[in-house]
């Protein structure tokens, strides 16, 4: 792994790359010590309880709760499991507990019967527990490592609680699979099905797009003057905002997205800027670094229309964000620019997707433990570069990304068009 040129591979290439983590600050050490104490007591009690009771047989689920807090991408990574639950337990009722901002990721999903929102107040948490107890749910899948999420299932009286074995945080679970922050999160979530004697879920994510959303997207493209004979690339320069946190360290520089768009436009490729909620300043900064014009700016759209627009793209260039997963969920090729995140953990798997990761000595540093214990989060939960250099993103140039994008477009079956400049870039990269 060099620090002067980026690496381009499928996500699976980087399985088990080690993390580069500095020592925890005092506050983080205190929080971790308290968590370790709670988990030690909990694990000791759990072992004693198991020793006193007979071995419990697996329950055939009739009512299932899936706990998945986080942003859009987190929810989409759970869709393979949800699909597998419906396939193997078609008569079971499936509830999913998600953050408010991620609800749209499951609306219209055939795999979910009821969507529950993560409460904001103590009163609402008590109401949620009462509802879960009243529903008499028999099985919970907890898709988080920290013990608090599995405690919720325990307090809700759910007898079968399945999740991840991470240190001692799984003491409230009745069944678990190993967890690693250096392996594909989607694959690990899908593996939870094996706890019920079923094969692991196929990792292909899914997102439901209605016909109405498709018509809206086509109308939008027609208004922009979209030419189906030319390649179309979607660029999303924003993201990095999840439920309750901001992650600017995970964003490639917006001006470099603009420079990339300029190179693509000069190469004869149509470019659409994808702008989600809160992305306006990043899109504006990207456009300032272009002398040409983009085909259009997809802003203020419902998520389904935003997704339908992505479907028309030959390829999407993104940061490690929800739109990365949204594109992959619709089998749209993705080129993901990754910095502090482990390059095997969140990016989508498959030959159609490419991950650009600089592999600088201080990366990857974005670990689930960091979120819990606050190593590089300030009081407002803002994830920042712990060295203050953002070297992992600064090391990736627009020209490098351009070559990867051009090569991917040329590799697409029945590719109708690509400018000579883009073809030359591929030759230079070969």
Residue ranges and their predicted role:
Residues 2-430:
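Catalytic machinery of carbohydrate-active enzymes
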């Amino acid at each position: 792994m060099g620090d002067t040129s980026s690496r381009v591979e499928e996500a699976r290439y980087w399985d088990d790359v080690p993390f580069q983590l500095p020592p925890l600050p005092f506050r983080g050490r205190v929080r971790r010590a308290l968590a370790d104490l709670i988990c030690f007591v909990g694990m000791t009690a759990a072992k004693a309880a198991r020793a006193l009771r007979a071995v419990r047989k697996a329950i055939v689920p009739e009512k299932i709760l899936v706990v998945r807090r986080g942003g859009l991408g987190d929810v989409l990574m759970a869709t393979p499991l949800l699909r597998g639950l419906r396939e193997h337990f078609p008569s079971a009722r499936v509830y999913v507990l998600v953050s408010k901002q991620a609800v749209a990721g499951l609306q219209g999903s055939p795999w979910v019967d009821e969507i529950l929102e993560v409460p904001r107040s103590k009163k609402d948490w008590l109401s949620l527990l009462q509802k879960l107890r009243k529903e008499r749910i028999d099985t919970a899948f907890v898709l988080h490592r920290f013990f608090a999420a599995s405690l919720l299932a325990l307090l809700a009286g759910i007898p079968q609680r399945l999740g991840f074995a991470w240190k001692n945080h799984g003491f409230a679970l009745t069944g678990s699979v190993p967890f690693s922050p250096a392996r594909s999160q989607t694959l690990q979530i899908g593996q939870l099905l094996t706890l019920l004697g079923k094969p692991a879920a196929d990792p292909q994510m899914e997102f439901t797009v209605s016909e109405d959303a498709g018509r809206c997207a086509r109308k939008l493209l027609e208004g922009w003057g979209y030419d189906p004979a030319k390649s179309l690339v979607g660029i999303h320069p924003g993201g990095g905002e999840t439920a309750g946190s901001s992650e600017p360290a995970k964003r490639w520089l917006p001006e470099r997205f603009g420079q990339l768009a300029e190179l693509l436009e000069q190469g004869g490729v149509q470019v659409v800027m994808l702008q989600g909620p809160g992305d306006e300043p990043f899109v504006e900064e990207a456009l300032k670094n272009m002398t040409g014009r983009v085909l259009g700016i997809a802003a203020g759209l419902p998520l389904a229309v935003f997704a339908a627009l992505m479907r028309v793209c030959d390829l999407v260039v993104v940061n490690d964000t929800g739109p990365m997963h949204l594109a992959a969920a619709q089998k749209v090729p993705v080129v993901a620019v990754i910095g502090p995140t482990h390059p095997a953990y969140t990016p989508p798997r498959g030959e159609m997707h490419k991950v650009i990761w600089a592999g600088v000595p201080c990366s990857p540093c974005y670990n689930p433990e960091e979120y819990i214990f606050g190593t590089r989060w300030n009081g407002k939960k803002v994830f920042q570069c712990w060295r203050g250099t953002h070297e992992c993103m600064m090391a990736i140039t627009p020209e490098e990304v351009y070559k990867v994008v051009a090569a991917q477009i040329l590799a697409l079956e029945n590719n109708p068009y690509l400018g000579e400049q883009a073809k030359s870039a591929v030759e230079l990269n070969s």
